[in-house]
Amino acid sequence: ENKLNAGIKNGIIWHTQGSGKTALAYYNVRYLTDYYQKRGTIAKFYFIVDRLDLLTQAADEFRARGLHVDEIDSKEDFIRNIHSTGTVNNTGKPTITVVNIQKFSKESIVKQSDYAVNIQRIYFLDEAHRSYKPTGSFLANLLSSDREAVIIALTGTPLIGTIYDDEGKPIAGKKYDSKSVFGNYIHKYYYNRSIADGYTLKLIREGIETTYKKKLKKALEEIEMLKGSLDKKELYAHPKYVSALVRYITDDFRKSRIAMNDQSIGGMIVCDSSAQARAIFEELKSYPCSAALILHDVDDKETRKGNIDAFKKGTIDFLVVYNMLLTGFDAPRLKKLYLGRIIKDHNLLQALTRVNRPYKNYRYGYVVDFADIRAEFDKTNKAYF
């Protein structure tokens, strides 16, 4: 309220991963509806995501909390929505429009005549560290859609520092700070506070046992002797290496369930490549555990959703992934993350915090480190904790 009264219409809310940013948006809808009503203004709320699975997840959560949700199916629908002057629905509930940022186009711009009615549009940008790049056309379209809009960027990991390419290599001369795009921080809620308040768990990094390190190293050496020079991705997807890796993972997972006296915990295996993910999934079939392979080109969307829901309900032991589900995925029973590749900066923090959701009486989430992320983990801690 103080920011709005001071004429500030944009900024970042940095709340740690897992602390409930969708819930925060919900409470803001309630509060800001009343705030603008007192000023004779109609508030129109938009929750903006960059992935279809997050759209469905957010819409479901808003409905569960009692909001009326408008879901946008096309750019044409969105053009009609943003040009409309009201938020009327037959339920009497407050309304929020959940929309993919790709629906913003050059045509979805509020015309001067639309300002004749007292309307205040409020945009909540979910996961604002990710796809809202200052050079991207989607963000440019969003920012120009309504010059008077209030823009609240929600993130658990604002982008700070070096930008990396898709292979994880730093791009020379490229730096990024979310504040340069969305404005200063409106509010911050750090990891230590979130842990102290019981909203998230501490993370423990577990190294690999020395005997298994030797076995994995030996497997790599034997592959190189048999096959000659292979690139890293081929080595790590080779059956001999995958066999040793899966043996370790399944043994560790079994021991963890015994040590925690809890058969309900789940695991996620973050693979070095999609080829390795496929190989690990096949190898897991030899063990008395259940697993689902989650890759963008494996199965259709409904099948993947069914597998993800089954994991959340506890009927699948492992999710095997490469890039998918490392952000925006929430499953409290996920307590063991098997990390098979180096991930950088905010992307690393996003991945690690898949295991920080409160569950039963757990105090920790566990990261089993096959990739030796110690240096990256320390660097990320300094930037975000």
Predicted regions and their residues:
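Conserved C-terminal RecA-like helicase domain
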Residues: 92, 233-321
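Inter-Walker segment of RecA-like/P-loop motor cores
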Residues: 63-110
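Walker A/P-loop
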Residues: 7-28, 266
